[in-house]
Amino acid sequence: MSKGTPSMGKRNKGSYHIRCRRCGRRAYHVRKKRCAACGFPNKRMRKYSWQNKKVNGKRIK
């Protein structure tokens, strides 16, 4: 297989992410065995303050 742009078209044969058991989103990475959305199989849920927009529309820098 060659490097570069021609080999990028061969990447869409399978799927990297399947449905997560905990959150139900299609974000569980099969090879990494980790959900990109909720962090499963970690015990703590993955959540950050920057995921949600502020209610009053102002972002704090």
Curated annotation (Swiss-Prot):
Q: Does the keyword Kinase apply?
A: no
A GO cellular component annotation here is: cytosolic large ribosomal subunit
Q: Which Gene3D superfamilies match?
A: 2.20.25.30
Write one Pfam family the protein is assigned to: Ribosomal_L37e
Cofactor dependency: Zn(2+)
Q: How is the cofactor bound?
A: Binds 1 zinc ion per subunit.
* Binding site residues for Zn(2+): C20, C23, C35, C38
Any GO MF annotation of the entry: rRNA binding
Against HAMAP family, the record matches this protein to: Ribosomal_eL37 (MF_00547)
Known function: Binds to the 23S rRNA.
Homology family: Belongs to the eukaryotic ribosomal protein eL37 family.
Cited NCBIfam families: PRK04179.1
Name this protein carries in UniProt: Large ribosomal subunit protein eL37
Record the organism. Methanocaldococcus jannaschii (strain ATCC 43067 / DSM 2661 / JAL-1 / JCM 10045 / NBRC 100440)
